[in-house]
């Protein structure tokens, strides 16, 4: 107050106090009126220091005078007071305010007349930018426009693109210009022909109107008189520069052609602005969460584009600005009154309607203001004082509730003064001091210490209410002992506008710290030194400022030099150029949690996926979202040094016009290390204990509250593109856990667990269930105490950066939690409504099944088997599916069950768990978990797993195992079971198969329907029963086969089969034996496949043959089934093997087959090892693998394996750079043929196939079902070349897996060599060459080309070897030993060499010299010996393996 009172001293103060307020009034001016005037000037952003001098008061009067006509009474009173003060400074003798105003008017009138007289005598200056000056001869000449001005104009047009800002920019740059200069400016932007055409039309219209209103004089002109300008003369098309100068400067009859032309240009610019900015001022409305400042910016930007008079624009400002604001801001603006200034509006609405993160950040910063620093405090840098001793939680002044502040309050706003908080007056009428405790009933920082930002810094910035000291203060506790306090950097909270006192060039002033401003702009400050004029843009338009360089700015003892702009700004601003020098940072307290270190998978680099194009509205939405996230500290801008990128896109939120940002992290997820999920499932309400008090909380912005590892952030980079590549994309990276990234759930769960552990330990009576951001808090405490503990939990989370919004804070039942509805003594699932549709799609059925599965955990008897049958196979989501009668019945049954609400109860630890299981037929089961009868904790259902052959007891064991695992997870212990099976039935089955599955203890109850075994296999041969030796064989190529049996009594039955496989034939042989046998039978088979199926005692099967076998088994009294190894000389087995193999399969005989088979039976080695160790051709080795029952036991077809026969190729089309590449891959070698084709047609595909067949032997081509592959041209090419064309899934569910993998490999190589080739077709052939001949690996360590040649050569050798062996088999050998003169034989010829032969005689292989052997042809006589290789048959040829020799 002393500073303001020092405006007048001594005699001047005495004179001031003698002046009356009104004529004849007793009240006189006092010192308090000076204090009041100083404060009012600050409200109007004027310098109160100017009141100290006469010149200063005169400047204030000139500044305020234009606003008197529309100003408030307070403004008029202020102007009157300054006028009186001006008279006091000038020593004028006045008695009251009226005389002071009269004196002021007289002095000002005399000055104006003197200036007018001086102007008449001085030469006319029409412009400062383009002056028309007088030369040495006294002639008026024109000074040409400068290149710098033209450059500024062109740059403005290119940057602003005819936005509303271009009009004041044109007016500023063209001030004083003549039409010649203006046309020069327009010619400089000739690239915008569309806009200039619009401007030309406006000029023509205005010129025509000028000619109509200013007709030319009739007759010739007098000598020496210049003609009057026409419309085209004003436009500069038919006039010269000299004529334009004369018209402008010819005294009283001057015509300012330049100003007239400028008005026409402005009219055209207005039209262009309206065209380029079609948004109407009526459409500018403030969003529900949009900051008021951003809304004002958009409002005035659009207002400048409106073609209206200034009076209309003033009306729009007074009414629409308030009318179109959001409800929160509108209520505050209306409370300010109709005459509130824009500054008052922006001050009042600061933080209102903005993102809720502001309140969270500020509350977090203030709540921890005195908590983390033990034994110390942080001097908080604020505009107004605060109470460091205030205790207690944050409390809202507006609604009185704890947990938030008034600026973030959603309750209706209190009316009242924005200074003192009292109702009955507004801020402009406040007499109660500068700042009261409005919105600060309880400061957020009261009772807490701020987090320690650094170890040591300078002294505190501003004293607290108790006074400041050099880094220490006395304790205010009862002891009163002083303590040392660690010194910390100053913090400037954002509860209010961050205004500080700064010394600029030696002058003290208050300025706003504005991180959104580039420059520092001050008003009414006199700086020394040279300055340059400059124009900057602000809220109200462009303003002219003076630019001073190297000005010293001091803030709280720290100095920095920088550029300062001085001009008529409404608020003094310290911009980023000064704040950066001071070392200021904008800190958003995301979380004090230590980041979890994350790495990429070994050998992998970050994603480098290009951003795909986005529409303009999506780019604008993403820009706004990212700007807000950047302000919150969630993301940061990055430069071009980061080589990684992940594409982003935007979608509209459901039932909303707002946009949501999505990041496609699929590529990053592939490359990121794997995480262990710390939580393997969601909590179940059946496992909750019944609690007296319950609360459900939700953590707001859960992932965004956890920091991301700084070393990993670079991999999350993404780019926001610009429309038409106008500017480079804006690059960002995440500072927090991103949504959609694979590591976010695990890291957040782990971090949240660590945060909750201290609270759990200190509050053991409180039970907290945590799943992601949902928290269930239960206790048996009284409700009031329970809620206190919940508030402590919320505060605990808040200190770590996690908020729990009031909107999702559930205090009263029913509680909605994790999809469940919790009541005090029961729970249920949230209401489920099944849709009633006439037309069902696959997607509808999927959603329906999901709802029913969710309901089955409390509703008993829910069945979905028939519904699931409708969507089997690969179908489109939109494909229409007709409901079967069974599915309709099942759906209606489920509807009936869901009509009546069903509830579950809570867990009681002192009681046992029980489970009841029921069978519903067709492999469907239901179960209930309970402690008391008819009070279920949980229910569920089970459907038979994917198994071709099973029985009820096996399914029952699976149900029990499933329920047991659930019980261990939910309740931590095993329940007791009540099962629908008799003890005898179970023990009979379980005695042999106990090792198959783990089963807990149970009780056997007689609750129908009971489960029983329909047949039983004997463990020992049945004495007196007939024995059937069964076998089957099939030819892979012809699909023909035989199946049958022989008995020890000589009875036999052989049937022929068509379109069969070896496994089907084996099963058919068992079926024939069962059909032809009596009530008791022994069956012997050499097929492990058959033994495995029947010995499991299935009661149902998906295979028709197995189902028939089951039916036959149920008719028998006793059945014994055993297995014997094939081809081991077992009589009956060998006999039936010969019978079914005749004319079906042939066997290749080579040395080492027996040893290889025995070795494989021991170790089950692969065919490569057999071929290498025993010298067998690959085909023979593969046949041995195919004949192994343990290596092929799971089905009739070798699913999951690709056919690697030498003549099989896969073909597919892929796309790159908008072109089509057709690729053919040799499956066995990975050799590639590829080229670019002009179109994906059948003709081009067939032509490529012909070229492929001309180069390489192709027997089979495998493709997908694309139209180019199924075309008539492709069929014709396959027919002509004799190539078998296969579609679909012949051997592998992903039958195109080889060519798809090669497509990826080929594209990868193309990217590596792309910069070496001009055209894509060249790059494709280069990549094919690299793949085929420059990269080794895989089988044999060859290149793909070498491997292909080796395979083809091996195929030829194998074929020739087969011919040679078959030829040799037609000869027999008689031989003799060296010591025995008797000829032995005949033996089998295995090999004939130049000096010796290799023979096999009675199982022994011998090498006999050529001279001691006689070779004769076999003419069909049956050779003796049961072990002769000629009579031995193997099952191997019937197996479906590649490379079989027919």
Curated annotation (Swiss-Prot):
Domain of life the protein comes from: Viruses
Domain Reverse transcriptase residue range list: 632-822
Region ranges (Interaction with Gp41): 7-31
Region annotation (Dimerization of protease) ranges: 490-494, 538-544, 577-589
Domain Integrase catalytic: 1202-1352
Chain positions covered by the region annotation Interaction with membrane phosphatidylinositol 4,5-bisphosphate: 73-77
GO-annotated molecular function: aspartic-type endopeptidase activity; DNA binding; DNA-directed DNA polymerase activity; exoribonuclease H activity; lipid binding; RNA stem-loop binding; RNA-directed DNA polymerase activity; RNA-DNA hybrid ribonuclease activity
Pfam families for the chain: Gag_p17, Gag_p24, Gag_p24_C, IN_DBD_C, Integrase_Zn, RNase_H, rve, RVP
Gene3D superfamilies, per database record: 1.10.10.200, 1.10.1200.30, 3.30.70.270, Acid Proteases, HIV Type 1 Reverse Transcriptase, subunit A, domain 1, Human Immunodeficiency Virus Type 1 Capsid Protein, Immunodeficiency lentiviruses, gag gene matrix protein p17, Integrase, C-terminal domain superfamily, retroviral
Zinc finger (Integrase-type): 1151-1192
Site positions per UniProt: Cis/trans isomerization of proline peptide bond: 219-220
Keyword check for Nucleotidyltransferase: yes
Motif annotated as Nuclear export signal, chain positions: 16-22
DNA-binding region: 1371-1418
Activation and inhibition: Protease: The viral protease is inhibited by many synthetic protease inhibitors (PIs), such as amprenavir, atazanavir, indinavir, loprinavir, nelfinavir, ritonavir and saquinavir. Use of protease inhibitors in tritherapy regimens permit more ambitious therapeutic strategies. Reverse transcriptase/ribonuclease H: RT can be inhibited either by nucleoside RT inhibitors (NRTIs) or by non nucleoside RT inhibitors (NNRTIs).
Region (RT 'primer grip'): 815-823
Location of the region described as Disordered in the Swiss-Prot/TrEMBL record: 458-482, 1422-1446
EC identifiers of the protein: 3.4.23.16, 2.7.7.49, 2.7.7.7, 3.1.26.13
Cofactor note: Binds 2 magnesium ions for reverse transcriptase polymerase activity.
Active site: 514 (for protease activity)
Keyword DNA-binding: yes
Keywords: Activation of host caspases by virus, AIDS, Aspartyl protease, Capsid protein, DNA integration, DNA recombination, DNA-binding, DNA-directed DNA polymerase, Endonuclease, Eukaryotic host gene expression shutoff by virus, Eukaryotic host translation shutoff by virus, Host cell membrane, Host cytoplasm, Host endosome, Host gene expression shutoff by virus, Host membrane, Host nucleus, Host-virus interaction, Hydrolase, Lipid-binding, Lipoprotein, Magnesium, Membrane, Metal-binding, Modulation of host cell apoptosis by virus, Multifunctional enzyme, Myristate, Nuclease, Nucleotidyltransferase, Phosphoprotein, Protease, Repeat, RNA-binding, RNA-directed DNA polymerase, Transferase, Viral genome integration, Viral nucleoprotein, Viral penetration into host nucleus, Viral release from host cell, Virion, Virion maturation, Virus entry into host cell, Zinc, Zinc-finger
Family annotation (InterPro entries): Aspartic_peptidase_AS, DNA/RNA_pol_sf, Gag_p24_C, Integrase-like_N, Integrase_C_dom_sf_retrovir, Integrase_C_retrovir, Integrase_cat-core, Integrase_Zn-bd_dom_N
Region Dimerization/Multimerization of capsid protein p24, residue ranges: 276-362
Misc: HIV-1 lineages are divided in three main groups, M (for Major), O (for Outlier), and N (for New, or Non-M, Non-O). The vast majority of strains found worldwide belong to the group M. Group O seems to be endemic to and largely confined to Cameroon and neighboring countries in West Central Africa, where these viruses represent a small minority of HIV-1 strains. The group N is represented by a limited number of isolates from Cameroonian persons. The group M is further subdivided in 9 clades or subtypes (A to D, F to H, J and K).
Name of protein: Gag-Pol polyprotein
Species the sequence originates in: Human immunodeficiency virus type 1 group O (isolate MVP5180)
Lineage: Viruses, Riboviria, Pararnavirae, Artverviricota, Revtraviricetes
């Amino acid at each position: 107050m002393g500073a303001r009172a020092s405006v007048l001293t001594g005699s001047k103060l005495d004179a001031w106090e003698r002046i009356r307020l009104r004529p004849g009034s007793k009240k006189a001016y006092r010192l308090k009126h000076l204090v009041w005037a100083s404060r009012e000037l600050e409200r109007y952003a004027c310098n109160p220091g100017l009141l100290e001098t006469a010149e200063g008061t005169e400047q204030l009067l000139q500044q305020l005078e234009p606003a008197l006509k529309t100003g408030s009474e307070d403004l008029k009173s202020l102007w009157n007071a300054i006028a009186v003060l001006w008279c006091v400074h000038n020593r004028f003798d006045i008695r009251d305010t009226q005389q002071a105003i009269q004196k002021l008017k007289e002095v000002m009138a005399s000055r104006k007349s003197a200036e007018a007289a001086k102007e008449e005598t001085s030469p006319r200056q029409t412009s400062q930018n383009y002056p028309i000056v007088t030369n040495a001869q006294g002639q008026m000449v024109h000074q040409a426009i400068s290149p710098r001005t033209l450059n500024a104009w062109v740059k403005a047009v290119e940057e602003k693109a005819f936005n509303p800002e271009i009009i004041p920019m044109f007016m500023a740059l063209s001030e004083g210009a003549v039409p010649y200069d203006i046309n020069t400016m327009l010619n400089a932007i000739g690239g915008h022909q569309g806009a200039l055409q619009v401007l030309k039309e406006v000029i023509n219209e205005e010129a025509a109107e000028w000619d109509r209103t200013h007709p030319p004089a009739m007759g010739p002109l007098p000598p020496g008189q210049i003609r009057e300008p026409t419309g085209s003369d004003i436009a500069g098309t038919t006039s010269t520069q000299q004529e334009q100068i004369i018209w402008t400067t010819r005294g009283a009859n001057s015509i300012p052609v330049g100003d007239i032309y400028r008005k026409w240009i402005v009219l055209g610019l207005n039209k262009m602005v309206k065209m380029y900015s079609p948004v109407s001022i009526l459409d500018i409305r403030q969003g529900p969460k949009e900051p008021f400042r951003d809304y004002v910016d958009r409002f005035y930007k659009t207002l400048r584009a409106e073609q209206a008079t200034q009076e209309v624009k003033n009306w729009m400002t007074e009414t629409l600005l308030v009318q179109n604001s959001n409800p929160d801001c509108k209520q505050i603006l209306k409370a300010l009154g109709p005459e509130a200034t824009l500054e008052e509006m922006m001050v009042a609405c600061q933080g209102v309607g903005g993102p809720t993160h502001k309140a969270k950040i500020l509350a977090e910063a203030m709540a921890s203001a005195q908590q983390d620093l033990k034994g110390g405090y942080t001097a908080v840098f604020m505009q107004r004082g605060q109470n460091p001793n205030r205790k207690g939680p944050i409390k809202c002044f507006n609604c009185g509730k704890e947990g938030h502040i008034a600026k973030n309050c959603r309750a209706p706003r209190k009316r009242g003064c924005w200074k003192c908080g009292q109702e009955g007056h507004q801020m402009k009428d406040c007499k109660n001091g500068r700042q009261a405790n409005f919105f600060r009933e309880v400061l957020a920082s009261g009772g807490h210490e701020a987090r320690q930002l650094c170890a040591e810094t300078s002294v505190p910035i501003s004293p607290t209410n108790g006074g400041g000291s050099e880094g220490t203060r006395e304790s205010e506790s009862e002891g009163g002992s002083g303590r040392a306090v660690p010194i910390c950097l100053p913090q400037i909270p954002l509860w209010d506008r961050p205004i500080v006192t700064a010394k600029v060039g030696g002058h003290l002033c208050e300025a706003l710290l504005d991180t959104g401003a580039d420059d520092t702009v001050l008003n009414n400050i006199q700086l020394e030194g040279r300055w340059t004029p400059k124009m900057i843009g602000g809220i109200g338009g462009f303003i002219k400022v003076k630019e001073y360089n190297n000005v010293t700015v001091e803030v709280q003892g720290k100095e920095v030099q920088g550029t300062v702009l001085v001009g008529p700004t409404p608020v003094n601003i310290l911009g980023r150029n000064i704040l950066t020098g001071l070392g200021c940072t904008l800190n958003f307290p995301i979380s004090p949690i230590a980041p979890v270190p994350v790495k990429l998978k070994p050998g992998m680099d970050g994603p480098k996926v290009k951003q795909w194009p986005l529409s303009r509205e999506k780019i604008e939405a993403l820009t706004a979202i990212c700007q807000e996230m950047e302000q919150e500290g969630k993301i940061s801008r990055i430069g071009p040094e980061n080589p990684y990128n992940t594409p982003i896109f935007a979608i509209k939120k459901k039932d909303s016009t707002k946009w949501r940002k999505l990041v496609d992290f699929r590529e990053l997820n592939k490359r990121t290390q794997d995480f262990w999920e710390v939580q393997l499932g969601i909590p179940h309400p059946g496992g909750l204990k019944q609690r007296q008090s319950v609360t459900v909380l939700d953590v707001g912005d859960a992932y965004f509250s956890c920091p991301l590892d700084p070393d990993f952030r670079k991999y999350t980079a993404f780019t926001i593109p610009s429309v038409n590549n106008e500017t480079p994309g804006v690059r960002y990276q995440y500072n927090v856990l991103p949504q959609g990234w694979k590591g976010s759930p695990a890291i957040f769960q782990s971090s949240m667990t660590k945060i909750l552990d201290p609270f759990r330990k200190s509050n053991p009576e409180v039970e907290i269930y945590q799943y992601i951001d949902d928290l269930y808090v239960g206790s048996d405490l009284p409700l009031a105490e329970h809620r206190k503990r919940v508030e402590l939990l919320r505060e605990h989370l808040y200190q770590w950066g996690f908020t729990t919004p009031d909107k999702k804070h559930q205090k009263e039942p029913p509680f909605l939690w994790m999809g469940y509805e919790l009541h005090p003594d029961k729970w249920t699932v949230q209401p489920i409504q099944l849709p009633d549709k006439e037309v069902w799609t696959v997607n509808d059925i999927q959603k329906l099944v999901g709802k029913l599965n969710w309901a089955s955990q409390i509703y008993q008897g829910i069945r979905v088997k028939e519904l699931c049958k409708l969507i089997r196979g690969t179908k489109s989501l939109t494909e229409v599916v007709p409901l079967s009668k069974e599915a309709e019945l099942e759906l209606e049954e489920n509807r009936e069950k869901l009509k009546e609400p069903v509830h579950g109860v809570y867990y009681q630890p002192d009681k046992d768990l029980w489970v009841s299981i029921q069978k519903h037929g067709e492999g469907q089961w239901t179960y209930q978990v309970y402690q008391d009868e008819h009070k279920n904790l949980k229910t569920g259902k089970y459907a038979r797993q994917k198994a071709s052959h099973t029985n009820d007891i096996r399914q029952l064991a699976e149900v029990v195992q499933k329920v047991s695992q659930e019980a261990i997870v939910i309740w931590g212990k095993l329940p007791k079971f009540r099962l629908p099976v008799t003890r005898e039935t179970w023990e009979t089955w379980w005695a042999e198969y106990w090792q198959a599955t783990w089963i807990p203890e149970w009780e056997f109850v007689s609750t129908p329907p009971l489960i029983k075994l329909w047949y039983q296999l004997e463990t020992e041969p049945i004495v007196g029963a007939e024995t059937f030796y069964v076998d089957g064989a099939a030819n892979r190529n012809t699909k023909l086969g035989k199946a049958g049996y022989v008995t020890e009594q000589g009875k036999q039955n052989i049937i022929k089969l068509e379109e069969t496989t070896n496994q089907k034939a084996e099963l058919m042989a068992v079926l024939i034996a069962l059909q032809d046998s009596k009530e008791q039978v022994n069956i012997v088979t050499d097929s492990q496949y058959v033994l495995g199926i029947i010995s499991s005692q299935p009661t149902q099967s998906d295979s028709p043959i197995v189902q028939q076998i089951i039916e036959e088994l149920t008719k028998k009294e006793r059945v014994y089934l055993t297995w014997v190894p094939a081809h081991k000389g077992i009589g009956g087995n060998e006999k039936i093997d010969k019978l079914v193999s005749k004319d079906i399969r042939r066997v290749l005989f080579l040395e080492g087959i027996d040893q290889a088979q025995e070795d494989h039976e021991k170790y089950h080695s692969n065919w490569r090892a057999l071929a290498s160790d025993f010298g067998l051709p690959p085909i023979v080795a593969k046949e041995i693998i195919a004949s192994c029952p343990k290596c092929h036991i799971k089905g009739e077809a070798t699913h999951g394996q690709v056919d690697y026969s030498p003549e099989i190729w896969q073909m597919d089309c892929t796309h790159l750079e908008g072109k089509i590449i057709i690729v053919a891959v040799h499956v066995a070698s990975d050799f590639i043929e590829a080229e670019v084709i002009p179109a994906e047609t059948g003709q081009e595909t067939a032509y490529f196939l012909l070229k492929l067949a001309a180069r390489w032997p192709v027997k089979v081509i495998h493709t997908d079902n694309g139209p180019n592959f199924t075309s008539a041209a492709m069929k014709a090419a396959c027919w002509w070349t004799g190539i078998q064309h296969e579609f679909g899934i012949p051997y592998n569910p992903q039958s195109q897996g080889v060519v798809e993998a090669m497509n990826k490999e080929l594209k990868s190589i193309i990217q590596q060599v792309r910069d070496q080739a001009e055209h894509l077709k060249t790059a494709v052939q280069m990549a094919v060459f690299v793949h085929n001949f420059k990269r080794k690996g895989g089988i044999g360590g060859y290149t793909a080309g070498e491997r292909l040649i080796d395979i083809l050569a091996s195929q030829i050798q194998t074929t020739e070897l087969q011919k040679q062996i078959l030829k040799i088999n037609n000869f027999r050998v008689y031989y003799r030993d060296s010591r025995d003169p008797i000829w032995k034989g005949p033996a089998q010829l295995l090999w004939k060499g130049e000096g010796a032969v290799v023979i096999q005689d009675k199982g022994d292989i011998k090498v006999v010299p050529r001279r001691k052997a006689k070779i004769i042809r076999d003419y069909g006589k049956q050779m003796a010996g049961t072990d002769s290789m000629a009579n031995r048959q193997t099952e191997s040829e019937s197996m479906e393996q590649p490379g079989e020799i027919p």
